[in-house]
Amino acid sequence: MGTEPCRFCEIAAGRSDQEIVFAGDGLVAFLCEPPATWGHALIVPRSHKEDIWSIEPSEAAAAMKLARRLAHAMRDELGAVGVNLRQNSGGKAGQDVLHFHLHVVPRYEDDTVQPGCVWGAPPWQPPAGGDAERRRVADALRSALG
């Protein structure tokens, strides 16, 4: 982890102003900054695990179960017509934060993000709407996830 605290560990511990949409015993889901589309969320384990090789099978299963719940909330509350799941492990794969994370990206009829893009630096333009839209989306997802 180096000398800097892990950004995702800080978020999982509640020491960030990131919009958390789900906080469970082992996992936290929060809105990605910048988002590819409104509702783009990251699922991370609360404990620091660097990559796919570091997490326990039970943690991987829990992350996928939460991704499914998020996908339903994105469809039902935000009007998503599809969803992309993405997990990058290792620098060559585009992992830029060394804490396991699973992207859950809702897709809309009018979005322009390429579904097959390889994410390192965001190849998309963040959606318009600003803080008010981010709060609306976070509130809708939090409500749906209970």
Over which residues does each language-model region extend?
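HIT superfamily nucleotide-processing domains
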Residues: M1-G146
